[in-house]
Amino acid sequence: NPAILKKLKAINLAENNKFFLWHTWFSDVFNREDKEGFDIVIGNPPYFLYQESHVGEIGDLRSDKDYTIAFGGKLNAYKLFIANAVKKLLSTNGINCFIFQNSFLGDRQATNLRKYILKNDKIVKIDSFPERDSKKKRVFESVKMSVCISLIQNAKVDCDYVFPVYVWDDKYNSS
């Protein structure tokens, strides 16, 4: 139908900030015969709490089953990015490497996300940078934030396993 085709072509997908069409924009990645998804996803997701001004967005996210693991207490954007990467974006055996808030490692509000990762993925390693008071020791000198770097593989692990966690005294020396 030419009229419908004309309307579809008139839609400006770049202006729509409610969703991102991964399968459309990266069809070559998600429509491969041998595997779907990215082999590696690297990022520094934003750290911000969703506030009352984001009520509509929070409702939309809560209704998406892929993001339920990011909820629990206050919703921080970085948790949504992690959930999206581990549930939607990685190919089988793909690797996710993110740098994000160190509080994730012990935060009760991130329990669901940690449980999901431990059950469904393989943690290759975690580097923790707890220093935030000394500017020279921070990973990002201008940001007073403790961070960690996770390396997570989209691979099933059939039994308990050990993964290394390195705690760094500063950005150059681990303890």
Predicted regions and their residues:
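Basic, amphipathic N-terminal segments
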Residues: 1-17, 31, 35-36, 40
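Signature of N6-adenine DNA methyltransferases within the class I
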Residues: 20-24, 29-175
